[in-house]
Amino acid sequence: MNFAVLPPEVNSARIFAGAGLGPMLAAASAWDGLAEELHAAAGSFASVTTGLAGDAWHGPASLAMTRAASPYVGWLNTAAGQAAQAAGQARLAASAFEATLAATVSPAMVAANRTRLASLVAANLLGQNAPAIAAAEAEYEQIWAQDVAAMFGYHSAASAVATQLAPIQEGLQQQLQNVLAQLASGNLGSGNVGVGNIGNDNIGNANIGFGNRGDANIGIGNIGDRNLGIGNTGNWNIGIGITGNGQIGFGKPANPDVLVVGNGGPGVTALVMGGTDSLLPLPNIPLLEYAARFITPVHPGYTATFLETPSQFFPFTGLNSLTYDVSVAQGVTNLHTAIMAQLAAGNEVVVFGTSQSATIATFEMRYLQSLPAHLRPGLDELSFTLTGNPNRPDGGILTRFGFSIPQLGFTLSGATPADAYPTVDYAFQYDGVNDFPKYPLNVFATANAIAGILFLHSGLIALPPDLASGVVQPVSSPDVLTTYILLPSQDLPLLVPLRAIPLLGNPLADLIQPDLRVLVELGYDRTAHQDVPSPFGLFPDVDWAEVAADLQQGAVQGVNDALSGLGLPPPWQPALPRLF
């Protein structure tokens, strides 16, 4: 289990509301009792057999009995020693739990933080509580990190205890029974399931080799029936990596998962993850090429490889798909394993995350931050590139709204750390996942952001990113490790359905877009520090005289754009209104 994706409400509750030390200490006592009984049984058995052989019973039969009894005495003594070891391990587990209990934040403190945050948000009518809200969120992230560190420490200690515990040895007759069972089934080797297999780990009948699944396969890792070779899927194939039936030769690789950019590094690997599965998911190579547009400005040479994550969100990706929390948790596990493997190989790592995988990157950053300095990668070894980040501190939909939906397995995940590792966070203007309005009571801005989720974030309208027009947004300190870039959108997503109307759709959209953009932008604060988590507010501070001037200018611009779209000369040439 990856505890980094679980909020402190869950981790703290599990520790404080669980069974506690009692069962572990009871188990230790029970193992001690078993060890004493086994030692006593061994001593009694040895005493009886020795007494018989030394007093009344002599000759070949007595000698045979003594030799037969000796292994049983040894087995009893060994089992007694293992029971005593199990008792000691149970006490170590109890000690690990006791230390974890002391290091975990109490549920009462977690609840107090959430209650204080809710009160501050409810009373934040004019934004006066923004600093206190940010402080409460920062405290909550510290609580989260402390709980994660405690749980991972407990998991490591418990795993070490379990690893050190030797398995209780089998009875003296068990090995003979295993051999007889293998012979009865006609299998030769280990791990075979079925009849007549020769080799290891075959499942089926009459397979020869290793890891085959099916019947009458010869080779390694074949799936199906009567295949000859390695890694074939189907029936009656001869060769390597074939998919199908009755084929001979070599299978064509499916979708390559590697893209070399520039000189390939060397020694620089980009781990590229996709977003939540959609109706039109990108194949691996197009996804790698898409990611390269964002990674290359900072890293001109690297080797990009696709990293598989579940990318599911029940029920939107299917009724049999994983919940968002479980999907993210598995993704974090995959990402952390891949990062550690690349670092162990001596490579610098760049992580690319978009949409759900940006949340995965967020949890990985938090987990690495919770580790001691000597156990986590250095700032020169690991960096991140994010797009469509729902956890963006200012604008991410999961940061704007502090909500969870337990029925769907969807838990609030908070803001992406701004000071964990060098990061470039790209946001697409008006994509509601990463650029949701700060003032959602502005119905124009909110409706436009929802349309942005539908048309921009989903990929239904594929717009190539114009990185040259990106605007670097302000941060609170030059020491912040994250660079935030906003990529402007020339058209409002809200007008996409109108533009789909033949002939008059585009001119009508051009007519109203400049003024509508002015109204939409009232829902945003483009001067806010992007590294500071910013929940929603109610009413912006507006200079209505400036708004009136922008609307007047937008009306003129709208007429010009509409006439231009119809092929008519515009009557005025005003300056373009501000995009943001």
UniProtKB/Swiss-Prot annotation:
Looking up Pfam families in the UniProt record yields: PE-PPE (PF08237), PPE (PF00823)
Provide the GO biological process annotations: response to host immune response; symbiont-mediated perturbation of host innate immune response
Superkingdom is Bacteria
The disulfides recorded in the entry are none
Domain PE-PPE positions: 300-525
Protein purpose: Elicits a high humoral and a low T-cell response. Could be involved in directing the host toward development of a more humoral type of immune response.
What family does the database annotate?
Belongs to the mycobacterial PPE family.
Name under which the protein is recorded? Uncharacterized PPE family protein PPE42
Which organism encodes this protein? Mycobacterium tuberculosis (strain ATCC 25618 / H37Rv)
From the broadest rank down, the organism's phylogenetic lineage runs: Bacteria, Bacillati, Actinomycetota, Actinomycetes, Mycobacteriales
